[in-house]
């Protein structure tokens, strides 16, 4: 389109906007156009020029008329496009209105739901208030109060249960195999999130049916009468539609479930084979069980201990992890080991192997420097069984200090004062807790002194310090209660405390107070366990200086006959007076420390020669696991080797038959008399001298073939002439003549 046409189009649009499109205005416009003088009249030109100008005007008129016709066509097109644009705008506006209406409806629904929730909460609060008014006040016992404090203190974080996260913090992802392990797709273990152990791709497949976890609430402790009254009142006052808040509170009154493992017949038979294998004292018999039943827990744990004695730590860890994985695959759907409401008691015989698998797993993880994960597993074992049958109290202090959970250890020692709510043994009667709690408080005090705190934190710390005892006092009480710990601890650290006194050098640990044992070696086993496990936590120079200063203070108090010395020593003597040393003898040192009784190299070489090197059960790579067997359970290793079982039995039978034949041949040879190496020929009639015998054998008539012919002739009755000297003579000259 030309510039003139665009200008005229703009002019027309302006006229439309001003609403001056009537006929009168058009006439006026025409008049105005006609009244305008020609442009060339102002130049005073001649008539010819006027004629030319008239021609030019006519041409201009024609051009203008053609342009006007084009403009009219364009206007018509624009007018046609206007309703389409209006329709598009109207559709967009309708969509926007619909969206606004939908958003308003959603907001209204949300407001209604919020109002309903508020009304329901108000109703619940009113009902709870009525229940509290109508029911007698609930008086919590000391055990229930301790149970609440215990659950708050022993909360378990699932993030800390993964040892890979701790290894990442220590070494990074590049320096470990974690990054490569995650890339491997374990398709037959992928459908379930595991808590303790993530299975490896080379492990055998699993299946269910060999053992099951079931609820055994018959062993549950009966609820108190207060709980019974509260539950009855809630059921009578509430309607049929009970709110979820009331349901949760009703369940929290008595929400503890007891679980136990139940073996199937096949697993019981495998267990009998395991007991028979133990009587042989041959680890290869256990390997034979694992080959056909790769998830038998007791066999896996026993082989793990054998691998530790042969210094094969990787295989020991694999065996223990497989045992934990087998236990985790039979979890009940209500069994949640992290809530603290599930009990898995050790007193049931079929629970012991699974309980022991978690305990051995703690040792394996602790040797890998995953101390925080080991601490969380210790908490789980204590929540499963309050009686602490495996003496987790002897190792939980070590993992608390190594994982820098000082506040947890101090609160456990000073607030709870017992390892579990139902356990009556005070933690101040254990040497490991007395010394470890003092060390944890020492680290907390150092953290407070080094960090700059705000006013709020300083006030809170002053309140806590007024209630809690300082690290110096805790350590002095530990030294007074258990003075026999100092000397073996310093010997393990390869140091001594010596000070100059009266011109002489005196060693503090050789003082009679620390050297003499008032308990008469009743707790020597506990002292040895503590020293072998925790000596690494005391080897820094700052801690040794702190220990030395408190040893000097204790000796001064002993010399001054401070009343605290007599009070603490009398309480310890009264506690351990009736305890024999045999009580702690079953606590094996290797179970509670890194000390392992290893086998001699010649025994290890003999075991490797017998095939003890490659004993881990492997998954069959040629056979894919069936889809319905990928969701959990144990024992599919039996199906893996089931197709090869008959062949192996045939091979074994053939070997037995060969062995029996060899034994029979040996017996037959032993029964027969031995034949002499040189036997005399009875038919020989020659001289006895060996030289003459040799010359005699060279004679032609003593040829054995001739003698045989004579024997044949004698038997047939025919007589042959006696051999002559020229019998074998050949005349070659006659043969030459015949040829010629």
Curated annotation (Swiss-Prot):
Q: Which family, according to UniProt?
A: Belongs to the TCF25 family.
Q: Which GO terms describe its cellular component?
A: cell periphery; cytosol; nucleus; RQC complex
Basic residues: compositionally biased ranges: 1-11, 103-118
For bias kind Low complexity, which ranges apply?
Answer: 30-41, 86-102, 226-241, 641-672
Question: So what does this one do?
Answer: Component of the ribosome quality control complex (RQC), a ribosome-associated complex that mediates ubiquitination and extraction of incompletely synthesized nascent chains for proteasomal degradation.
PANTHER family on file = NULP1-RELATED, RIBOSOME QUALITY CONTROL COMPLEX SUBUNIT TCF25
The opening ranks of the lineage are:
Eukaryota, Amoebozoa, Evosea, Eumycetozoa, Dictyostelia
Please state what the protein is called. Answer: Ribosome quality control complex subunit TCF25
Q: Which residues form a coiled coil?
A: 54-134, 639-672
Q: Provide this UniProt record's keywords sorted from A to Z.
A: Coiled coil, Cytoplasm, DNA-binding, Nucleus, Repressor, Transcription, Transcription regulation
Pfam families (alphabetical): Tcf25
């Amino acid at each position: 389109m030309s510039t003139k046409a665009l200008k005229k189009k703009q002019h027309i649009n302006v006229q439309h906007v001003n609403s001056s499109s009537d006929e009168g205005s058009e006439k006026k416009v025409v008049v105005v156009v006609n009244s305008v003088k020609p442009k060339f009249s102002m130049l005073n030109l001649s008539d010819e020029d006027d004629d030319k100008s008239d021609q030019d005007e006519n041409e201009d008129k024609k051009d203008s008329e053609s342009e006007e016709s084009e403009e009219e066509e364009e206007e018509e097109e624009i007018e046609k496009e206007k309703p389409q644009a209006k329709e598009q705008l109207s559709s967009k506006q309708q969509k926007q209105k619909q969206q606004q209406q939908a958003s308003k409806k959603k907001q209204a629904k949300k407001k209604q739901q919020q109002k309903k929730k508020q009304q329901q909460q108000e109703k619940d609060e009113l009902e709870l208030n009525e229940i509290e008014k109508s029911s007698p006040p609930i008086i919590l016992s000391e055990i229930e109060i301790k149970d609440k404090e215990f659950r708050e203190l022993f909360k378990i974080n699932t993030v800390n249960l993964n040892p890979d996260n701790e290894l990442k913090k220590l070494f990074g992802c590049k320096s470990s195999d974690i990054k490569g392990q995650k890339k491997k797709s374990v398709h037959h273990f992928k459908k379930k999130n595991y808590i303790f152990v993530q299975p490896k791709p080379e492990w055998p497949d699993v299946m269910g049916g060999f053992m099951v976890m079931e609820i055994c609430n018959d062993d549950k402790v009966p609820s108190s009468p207060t709980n019974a009254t509260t539950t009855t009142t809630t059921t009578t006052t509430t309607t049929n539609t009970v709110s979820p808040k009331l349901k949760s509170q009703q369940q929290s009154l008595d929400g503890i479930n007891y679980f136990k493992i139940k073996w199937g017949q096949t697993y019981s038979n495998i267990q009998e084979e395991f007991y028979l294998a133990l009587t042989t004292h041959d680890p290869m018999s256990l390997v034979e069980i694992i080959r056909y039943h790769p998830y038998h827990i007791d066999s896996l744990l026993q082989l793990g201990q054998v691998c530790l004695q042969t210094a094969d730590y990787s295989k020991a860890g694999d065996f223990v992890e497989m045992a934990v994985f087998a236990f985790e695959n039979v979890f009940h759907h209500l069994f949640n080991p992290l809530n603290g409401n599930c009990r898995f008691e050790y007193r049931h015989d079929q629970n012991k192997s699974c309980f022991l698998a978690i305990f051995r797993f703690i040792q394996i993880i602790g040797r890998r420097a995953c101390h925080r994960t080991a601490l969380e597993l210790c908490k789980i074992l204590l929540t499963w069984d309050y009686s602490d049958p495996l003496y987790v109290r002897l190792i939980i202090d070590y993992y608390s200090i190594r994982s820098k959970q000082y506040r947890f250890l101090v609160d456990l020692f000073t607030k709870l004062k017992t390892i579990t709510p139902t356990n009556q043994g005070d933690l101040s009667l254990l040497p490991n807790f007395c010394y470890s709690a003092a060390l944890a408080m020492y680290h907390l005090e150092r953290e407070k002194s080094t960090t700059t705190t705000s006013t709020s934190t300083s006030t809170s710390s002053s309140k806590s310090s007024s209630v809690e005892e300082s690290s110096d006092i805790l350590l002095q009480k530990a030294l007074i209660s258990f003075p026999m710990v100092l000397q073996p601890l310093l010997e393990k650290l390869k140091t001594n405390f010596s000070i100059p006194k009266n011109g002489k050098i005196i060693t503090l640990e050789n003082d009679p107070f620390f050297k003499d044992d008032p308990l008469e070696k009743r707790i020597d086993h506990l002292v040895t366990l503590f020293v072998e496990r925790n000596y690494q936590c005391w080897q820094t120079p700052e801690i040794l200086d702190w220990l030395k200063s408190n040893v000097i203070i204790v000796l001064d108090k002993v010399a001054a006959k401070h009343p605290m010395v007599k009070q603490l020593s009398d309480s310890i003597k009264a506690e351990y007076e009736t305890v024999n040393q045999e009580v702690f003898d079953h606590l094996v040192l290797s179970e509670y420390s890194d000390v392992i009784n290893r086998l001699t190299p010649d025994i290890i070489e003999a075991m490797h020669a017998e095939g003890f090197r490659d004993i881990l059960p492997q998954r069959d790579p040629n056979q894919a696991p069936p889809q319905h067997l990928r969701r959990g359970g144990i024992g599919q290793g039996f199906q893996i080797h089931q197709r090869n079982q008959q062949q192996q039995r045939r091979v074994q039978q053939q070997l037995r038959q060969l062995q029996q034949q060899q034994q029979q041949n040996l017996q037959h040879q032993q029964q027969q008399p031995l034949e002499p190496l040189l036997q005399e020929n009875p038919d020989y009639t020659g001289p006895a001298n060996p030289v003459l015998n040799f010359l005699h054998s060279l004679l032609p008539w003593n040829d054995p073939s001739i003698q045989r012919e004579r024997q044949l002739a004698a038997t047939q009755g025919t007589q042959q002439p006696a051999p002559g000297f020229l019998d074998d003579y050949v005349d070659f000259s006659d043969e030459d003549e015949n040829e010629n």
